[in-house]
A protein has these predicted regions:
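N-terminal binding-site loop/beta-alpha segment at the start of enzyme catalytic domains
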Residues: 1-80
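Acidic (Asp/Glu)-rich catalytic clusters
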Residues: 8, 41, 70-81, 110-114, ...
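Active-site mouth loops of central-metabolism enzymes
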Residues: 20-30, 88-100, 129
Length: 315
């Protein structure tokens, strides 16, 4: 499997990133271990998480995902086989991007992950209350200390990203090398400005909501199918006329390609020139094998064009 380099100075990763928000939430520790085992056995290596995962779940408070991953790493001894990505700034217990908060949060994450370094450390959410120089300076000290290898920015708009890159250049600070925006066939907002910034500066891009919280798997055909599902709140907004029309095209392409809708949606993302790799999650081995199959799927140019047109119509 051909690896893809994250930006100019980041690590090389396989073309699909495991979204670790499910660990300790919709996948218990035993199930999570099986999923992670299968993931690396298939040759994939990048795992994305955050300190806040999954504080929104009933009875959860945050830190669960990192803890599960750390326990798996300790049990399996596979730290050198994976690229760990985690984030700081969104969790109520460690909110914001002040220097003090970043310094405390990274040590907490390292402890939960049971490792001495994080491969890609993201600012989870922009913090306009803190000067960019303070945030980037704090991140730079983590790089100097060996606690972090590469920096990333999640949920930053194009204007703030350009400002951050300028501050890094002007003040000789490490720059954001990777960005993590929402991006999928339905949500094309990344293409308006961020994609151009990423390509101009040679940034790596790993997208979240790559399957639109499961909408693009095709397993939900109506709002009624969502009742009682853990992701019901995330999914409801996709079931409009535009989303349903997109699903029809997605199912048609999948049938013609002898693939699943999830594989097609991910393969389309993998073909996008500005994207390094999409992030996707699974809670069962069957689901995981399905999404990993996207890496082997080569869609025809006509299929890609049909998906692109349908997605733009839904944007």
């Amino acid at each position: 499997m051909q690896k893809r380099k994250l930006g100019q100075g980041g690590p090389e990763i396989a073309p699909l990133v495991f979204g670790g928000n499910v660990f300790g939430w919709t996948a218990d520790e035993a199930s999570s271990f099986k999923l992670l085992d299968r993931f690396v056995e298939r040759g994939f290596n990048a795992i994305d998480t955050a300190d806040v995962y999954s504080s929104w779940g009933p009875g959860l408070s945050g830190g669960e995902s990192e803890t599960v991953i750390g326990n798996w790493l300790a049990r399996r001894g596979r730290r050198d086989d994976v690229v760990l990505m985690t984030k700081v700034g969104m969790w109520d217990q460690r909110k914001g991007l002040s220097a003090a908060n970043i310094a405390a949060a990274v040590d907490d994450s390292l402890r939960r992950l049971r490792t001495d370094h994080i491969d890609v450390y993201f600012a989870h959410l922009d913090d306009a209350e803190v000067p960019l120089a303070e945030t980037l300076g704090a991140f730079g000290r983590l790089v100097e200390a060996g606690k972090v290898r590469t920096l990333g920015a999640s949920n930053h708009d194009a204007k703030r990203l350009r400002e951050a890159l300028a501050v890094s250049k002007e003040q000789g600070l490490p720059r954001y090398e990777v960005i993590q925006p929402p991006y999928n066939l339905y949500d094309r907002s990344f293409e308006s400005e961020l994609a151009a910034v990423a390509q101009k500066h040679g940034l790596g891009v790993v997208s979240y909501f790559s399957l639109a919280s499961g909408f693009l798997t095709g397993k939900y055909r109506s709002v009624e199918d969502l009742k009682g599902k853990a992701r019901e709140g995330f999914l409801q907004g996709y079931f409009d006329a535009r989303g349903l029309a997109l699903l029809e095209v997605l199912r048609k392409v999948a049938e013609e390609a002898k693939a699943t809708p999830a594989q097609v949606a991910l393969a389309w993302l993998m073909s996008r020139p500005a994207l390094t790799a999409p992030i996707a999650s699974a809670t069962s081995l069957e689901q995981l094998d399905d999404i990993l199959g996207a890496a082997d799927l080569q869609l025809s140019s006509s299929a890609l064009d049909a998906l692109d047109a349908a997605g733009k119509a839904a944007a």
